[in-house]
Design a protein with these regions (language model features):
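Conserved CoA-thioester-binding segment of acyl-CoA-metabolizing enzymes
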Residues: 1-57, 91
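Glycine- (often His-adjacent) and acidic-residue-rich active-site loop
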Residues: 55-92, 108
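Histidine-centered beta-alpha loop that forms part of the nucleotide-sugar donor binding/catalytic region
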Residues: 20, 65, 105
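Hydrophobic alpha-helical membrane-association signature
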Residues: 32-35, 82-85, 115
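Hydrophobic/aromatic residues within transmembrane alpha-helices
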Residues: 17, 54, 66, 115-117, ...
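Crotonase-fold acyl-CoA enzyme core
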Residues: 91-176
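Phosphate-coordinating loops and pocket residues in cytosolic domains that bind phosphorylated ligands
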Residues: 27-30, 63, 72, 136, ...
Length: 176
């Protein structure tokens, strides 16, 4: 399957979905959400796939939303369309019928944090660092971040991370 921003392959009984916008640190564009949905649809329909692993190519898991693309959304319909496509994928991943495992390395920011937490199991490398960076760009957590983060680390810690945009390194991540 050829996708523009995501690699998808099946190894044994595992569907492997890899973010592949390395020049943009795998920032979440509208196209990446479309491609993720397509890859998950393929994994869902393939009876040989028993679980799905989401990882990323390059030096970062995901730098968050594609801010230049988001700034270019110049009318309400375009904004709605972008977030609708994102929401369709996030809902699909959160409610996916097969187990999902996210495997992250390097920078994990904003929507990347939401993607990490949307999996049934999240694994991070020792070099991983995440930040709930929405406030730094004047947004509230999207991509279900406002719902996923409190479930992962508790309400008070989630509020702290959302309000301060404090970077959290892998060892502390495991404590949360």
């Amino acid at each position: 399957m050829e996708l523009e921003t995501v690699l998808y392959r099946v190894e044994g009984n595992v569907g492997i979905v890899s973010l592949n916008r390395t020049k943009a640190l795998n920032a979440m564009s509208k196209q990446i959400f479309v491609d993720l949905t397509t890859a998950f649809d393929a994994a869902e329909k393939d009876d040989t796939v028993r679980c799905v692993v989401v990882n990323a190519e390059g030096r970062a898991f995901c730098a968050g939303g594609d801010i230049p693309e988001m700034k270019g959304l110049d009318n309400p319909e375009a904004v709605f369309d972008f977030y609708n496509v994102a929401g369709i994928f996030m809902k699909k991943m959160i409610n996916f019928v097969k187990p999902t495992i996210t495997v992250a390395h390097g920078a994990i920011a904003g929507a990347g944090t939401s993607l990490l937490l949307a999996g049934d199991i999240a694994l991070v490398s020792d070099d991983a660092m995440f930040m709930v960076a929405f406030g730094a760009v004047g947004l509230i957590p999207d991509c279900a971040g406002h719902w996923l983060l409190p479930r992962a680390c508790g309400l008070n810690m989630a509020k702290e991370l959302m309000m301060t945009q404090r970077a959290v390194k892998a060892p502390e991540m495991k404590e949360l």
